[in-house]
């Protein structure tokens, strides 16, 4: 509906809609109050002597690297795709696998806090339309976590600075 309204109001052509899965990568938000799971676990792993993770790690998610999202957006525009398109890996990746990958890189143990919620059991995108149209993410979860950790370690000061615009504007409003 938003695209139809935009088209009517501005007389522009078609509108493209992408729905990215859990996006991660360099330059992400590592602020513990607002970070998503991968940057949050990376920060915890490299600022503590153990990696504390909520739940039991069984939750399944779909992750996609930020570069693959950018590539997917360009793909959608260049191919004039006007139907909503999911951008994810389509891979079922457990939080346990994410935590183990990060803890191994940091050379620390994992402590599972099963008194905290695990989250929804499974949230994975249907990538059949993207597959049919020819879009396939290129960065594996292991490669993506590795380059996100490398960026984080080289840019900790910037990474640990909040990028929450609402926090920054709180006193100005």
Specify the residue positions occupied by each region the protein language model found.
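Active-site Tyr-X1-5-Lys
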Residues: 1-21, 42-48
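Amphipathic alpha-helical recognition patches that constitute DNA-binding helices
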Residues: 19, 36, 40, 94, ...
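Hydrophobic alpha-helix immediately C-terminal to the catalytic Tyr-X-X-X-Lys motif of short-chain
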Residues: 2-6, 37, 41, 98, ...
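Flexible, glycine-rich beta-alpha linker
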Residues: 13-37
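Short-chain dehydrogenase/reductase
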Residues: 31-39, 62-63, 92
């Amino acid at each position: 509906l938003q695209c139809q309204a935009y088209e009517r109001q501005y007389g522009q052509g078609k509108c493209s809609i992408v729905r990215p899965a859990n996006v991660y990568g360099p330059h992400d938000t590592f602020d513990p109050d607002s970070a998503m799971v991968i940057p949050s676990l990376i920060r915890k792993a490299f600022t503590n002597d153990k990696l504390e993770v909520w739940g039991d790690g069984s939750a399944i998610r779909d992750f996609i690297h930020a570069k693959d999202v950018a590539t997917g957006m360009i793909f959608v525009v260049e191919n004039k795709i006007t139907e909503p398109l999911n951008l994810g890996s389509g891979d079922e990746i457990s939080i346990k696998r994410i935590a183990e990958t990060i803890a191994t890189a940091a050379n620390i143990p994992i402590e599972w806090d099963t008194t905290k919620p695990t989250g929804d059991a499974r949230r994975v995108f249907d990538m059949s339309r993207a597959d049919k149209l020819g879009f396939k993410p290129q960065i594996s979860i292991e490669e993506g976590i590795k380059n996100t950790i490398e960026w984080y370690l080289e840019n900790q000061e910037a990474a640990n600075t909040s990028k929450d615009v609402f926090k920054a504007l709180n006193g100005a409003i």
